[in-house]
Regions:
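Long, positively charged amphipathic alpha-helical accessory segments at protein N-termini or as interdomain linkers
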Residues: 60-87, 95-218
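N-terminal start-of-chain detector that recognizes signal peptides
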Residues: 1, 21-29, 86-89, 151-154, ...
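N-terminal lobe of the biotin/lipoate ligase/transferase fold
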Residues: 1-78
């Protein structure tokens, strides 16, 4: 894996896809000027943040590609080793009930590009429900080291095909909660083998959701 680091960049996803040659490429930056989140949401820079993207050829993936957002989120949460750092299906990273990061997966021709955005420190978040992992700024070297370890962890899971949904679910806040999705509400029951969310509607019907447009209610 090749790594390139920036103090600021337009967009790590676009740069990673543009610069990809053959080996997996990791781009990491402390800030983005034109970042984007899931569903084309704008990227908001915290006082100290990490924006990183890992791009690789699809041919190295020999398991269900819809698991990649789950794998990417779990890879970060597992390396930080803070019991209050959790996952919300399918792509949010939560700390003490505040959203501190998220995952964005995009495909471009033969490439898969995984983006990760994390708020390390944010004294006064200007977004409802947003937060940061740390109460003070961290050494920039730690942030870039976290990015590299995150990238290597993902590639190791892909190479060895040993990503565990049980481990993922141990960090998940969503199961057992009432969730709202575009067509209604239901109770989150399980994560299927393809990474989709199984919910039970008030009428008892079981549905499998793949859309990230859900919100936890209770």
């Amino acid at each position: 894996m090749k790594s390139i680091f920036f103090d600021e960049i337009d967009n790590t996803q676009d740069f990673a896809i543009k610069e990809f040659k053959e080996e997996p490429l990791l781009i990491a930056s402390k800030a983005q000027t034109s970042g984007r989140g899931t569903n084309q949401n704008n990227w908001q820079n915290a006082d100290q943040s990490l924006a990183t993207s890992l791009v690789f050829n699809k041919k190295i993936v020999n398991f269900t590609k819809t698991l990649i957002p789950l794998l990417a989120g779990y890879s970060y949460v597992s390396l930080i080793k803070n019991q209050n750092l959790k996952l919300k299906w399918p792509n949010d990273i939560i700390f003490n009930d505040d959203k501190v990061g998220g995952v964005l997966v995009e495909e471009s021709n033969d490439l898969i590009c995984i983006g990760l955005g994390i708020n390390y420190f944010w004294k006064n978040p200007n977004l409802p429900g947003a937060g940061a992992i740390y109460e003070e700024k961290q050494d920039d070297r730690k942030i870039f080291q976290d990015a590299e370890e995150w990238g290597r962890t993902i590639l190791n899971y892909i190479e060895n095909e040993d990503f565990s949904l049980e481990n993922y679910m141990s960090k998940l806040t969503t199961l057992g909660k009432l969730v709202e999705y575009p067509e209604g509400r239901g109770w989150a029951k399980d994560i299927n083998d393809d990474g989709s969310l199984m919910i039970e509607t008030p009428s008892g019907e079981l549905l499998n959701l793949t859309s990230p447009l859900i919100s936890e209610i209770i």
